[in-house]
């Protein structure tokens, strides 16, 4: 009945349609006959939310090469090791071929000084070339909208979830036993429906954006937009320069997991202090109760 009212569907005439909506949005494995006609690659709730629309498809192909010490050294600088890379489907590429939006084909080949790393998704790929001044980030396939990295690796329940500015930050946090995701960029609009779903799974959702001007501005904007979901912001004690602005830089500078937990404890203490102050304002001193209210009109 509730779904019928919400979608404006007649309960009797559209009963089967209502069932299909419930099955699709809850990721239920029923109505096998209908699913056989319309095969779905991934049947989880979070994936369906992230695949409502896609950008134009760009054809691509690539050749994977094994990680060696040189290729792993870049990630090890941030405390990210091969087990974390594999869990998030990060690969090293020997070559990558695609075409521009205008249809012009091109090929990139990795070298010791310009490695090519790939974040491999379902039907799409994001290329990362950290040492390249041009074409540093590339996309191939059908990119989901919104793009969200790390969603598949999240547990069903957790204490804290961090919203970061990039994939490397997600990997840095995961390598230290923290849960994190990122969208396409810090300036991307975070869908409220996703935050609403995550709020049911995590006790605290914390924005952990860069400490530069853009990151601080966007963090404040998102905190305002998502105030109804009690999203908080944690500002890192960094200078905000190119080499000292995000959580990956924070760990690369020598800070440990325990140092980061200290920042979190300070943030949570401030949150709970504010809550206790609000609660105390509602307390009644029974030894000195307030005066009884007086009626303005006596009958």
Give the ranges of each region predicted by the language model.
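Short, aromatic/basic amphipathic alpha-helical patches
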Residues: 217-228
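TOPRIM metal-binding catalytic domain and adjacent DNA-binding surface shared by DnaG-type primases
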Residues: 15-115, 151-159, 265-285
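Phosphate-handling DNA/RNA-contact segment within nucleic-acid enzymes
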Residues: 95-201, 219
């Amino acid at each position: 009945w509730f779904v019928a009212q919400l979608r404006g569907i007649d309960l009797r005439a559209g009963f089967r349609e209502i069932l299909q909506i419930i099955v699709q949005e809850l990721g239920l494995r029923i109505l096998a006959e209908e699913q056989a006609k319309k095969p779905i690659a991934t049947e989880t709730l979070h994936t369906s939310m992230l695949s409502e629309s896609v950008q134009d498809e760009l054809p691509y192909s690539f050749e994977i090469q094994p990680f060696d010490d040189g290729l792993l050294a870049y990630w090890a600088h941030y405390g990210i090791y091969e087990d974390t890379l594999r869990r998030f489907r990060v690969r090293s590429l020997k070559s990558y071929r695609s075409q521009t939006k205008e249809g012009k084909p091109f090929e990139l080949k990795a070298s010791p000084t310009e490695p090519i790393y790939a974040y491999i998704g379902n039907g799409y790929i994001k290329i990362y070339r950290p040492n390249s001044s041009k074409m540093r980030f590339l996309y191939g396939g059908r990119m989901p909208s919104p793009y969200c990295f790390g969603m598949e690796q999240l547990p069903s329940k957790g204490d804290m979830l961090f919203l970061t500015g990039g994939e490397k930050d997600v990997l840095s946090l995961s390598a230290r036993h923290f849960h994190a995701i990122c969208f396409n960029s810090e300036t991307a609009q975070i869908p409220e429906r996703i935050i609403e779903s995550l709020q049911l799974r995590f006790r605290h959702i914390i924005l952990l954006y860069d400490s530069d001007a853009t990151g601080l501005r966007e963090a404040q904007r998102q905190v305002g937009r998502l105030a109804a979901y009690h999203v908080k912001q944690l500002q890192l004690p960094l200078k905000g320069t190119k080499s000292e602005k995000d959580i990956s830089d924070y760990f690369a500078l020598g800070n440990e997991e325990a140092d980061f937990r200290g920042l979190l404890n300070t943030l949570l203490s401030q949150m709970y202090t504010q809550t206790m102050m609000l609660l105390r304002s509602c307390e009644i001193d029974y030894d000195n109760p307030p005066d009884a209210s007086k009626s303005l009109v006596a009958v």
